[in-house]
Amino acid sequence: MSRIAETFAYLRAAGRTALMPYLMTGYPERDSALELAPALEAAGADLFELGVPFSDPLADGATIQRASERALANGIRLEHCIETVAGLRKRGVRAPIVPMGYYNPFLQYGLERLARDMADAGADGLIIPDLPPEEAHECHAACRAHGLDLIFFVAPTTPDERIDRIAALASGFIYCVALTGVTGARRELWSGLPAFLERVRRRTSLPLVVGFGISSAAHVREAGRYAAGAIVASALINVIEQAPPGEYVARAVDFVRSLRG
């Protein structure tokens, strides 16, 4: 059983919704993730999504685009993300770590090499938002060979037959997009979320994790009524971005604690 599967099994038995913060590698400073992740794990984070900066992040809204631009300006590349995963394990982070990046840099690095190096560093899976299931077989094989889960997105607009194709390839969990459009914090979750998640649930036994728009404890509780977990991304990056100099770790910790209600 993978570390991701073990985490969801434990949380399900405990009756707790998985909380998965998103951190951008190299944001706001080059090694900030090495400070943030251990502190957020102690504050209640159960898994981590670790962003790999990219110059054209199509699925991301303005907040994460700014974070990506700053990380690139800090000199961050894919290799540094792999080093960051290894550094987090050396610092004692036990939660699953799932790097999220766009396909082109991964392909240029080499999919087999990427899966090997990520696994050796201590990563647990990959999220690739622009990799369709029809083109994922090489990446899927590389991940499977090295014990990594490959996580796919499903959206409210995803047809049932495509969900079936995704479910046949996916492992770890299914990333369920809680709205149409790009990432970004929202005041309220989409009213059609329960029906959407039920439609996905009928087609897979994998845990469902809700992302896009999660920004409050109420959102986490609502997502937890219908899904196994919630990803908080733009709202957390906003907190880090708006923190006074030198206070971003403390502000992020307070925010993650608040999400637990």
Curated annotation (Swiss-Prot):
Pathway(s): Amino-acid biosynthesis; L-tryptophan biosynthesis; L-tryptophan from chorismate: step 5/5
InterPro entries listed in its UniProt record: Aldolase_TIM, RibuloseP-bd_barrel, Trp_synthase_suA
Disulfide pairings: none
E.C. number: 4.2.1.20
Sample GO molecular function, one term: tryptophan synthase activity
Entry keyword set: Amino-acid biosynthesis, Aromatic amino acid biosynthesis, Lyase, Tryptophan biosynthesis
Pfam families hit by this protein: Trp_syntA
Positions annotated as active site in the UniProt record: 49, 60
GO cellular component: cytosol
Catalytic activity: (1S,2R)-1-C-(indol-3-yl)glycerol 3-phosphate + L-serine = D-glyceraldehyde 3-phosphate + L-tryptophan + H2O
SUPFAM superfamilies referenced in this protein's UniProt entry, alphabetically: Ribulose-phoshate binding barrel (SSF51366)
HAMAP family associated with the record: Trp_synth_alpha (MF_00131)
Known function: The alpha subunit is responsible for the aldol cleavage of indoleglycerol phosphate to indole and glyceraldehyde 3-phosphate.
Subunit composition and interactions: Tetramer of two alpha and two beta chains.
Family (UniProt): Belongs to the TrpA family.
Name this polypeptide is given: Tryptophan synthase alpha chain
Upper taxonomic lineage: Bacteria, Bacillati, Chloroflexota, Chloroflexia, Chloroflexales
